Amino acid sequence: KNIDNRNEDELNKSDIYIKGDYNWNREALQNIIKNAIEHSNDKGTVKINITDNDVYTAVYITNRGEKLSDKQQKQIFERYYSEAKYEDNSMGIGLPLAKAVIEKQGGYISVESDDAETVFIVKYIK
């Protein structure tokens, strides 16, 4: 895959505070990003955007790849769920583990998908 790491935001990382364990949060977000890279088109782009307000900090991880069906969107966070075409490379615990870590720390994770892109939304409540 062609990976281009750019920071297009003017948001300074020192401006953001997320409650919880740094290492576990990093693992959860890295897992979601890795998944987005693996399932993006060959020349696709994975975008990471962060919004921060008084109520929550949200991380949006967006990729361009195959659309996730409504059924897939409901099952993607279930332990051991893996698409048949990816079963050789996946144990199906990455996204469920990320979800468990995020929720254990008071956050939420969701996914939205259409023909153009898939977006994982992680919100950490302040």
What is each model feature region?
Residues 43-55:
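Short beta-strand/loop element within the Bergerat-fold HATPase_c
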Residues 94, 98:
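Short alpha-helical Gxxx[C/S/T] motif in the catalytic ATP-binding
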Residues 13-20:
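Conserved micro-motifs of the catalytic ATP-binding
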Residues 35-37:
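Short helix-loop "hinge" at the ATP-lid/N-box region of the Bergerat-fold HATPase_c
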Residues 68-80:
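Short conserved segment of the HATPase_c
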Residues 25-29:
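A residue-level detector for a conserved hydrophobic packing site
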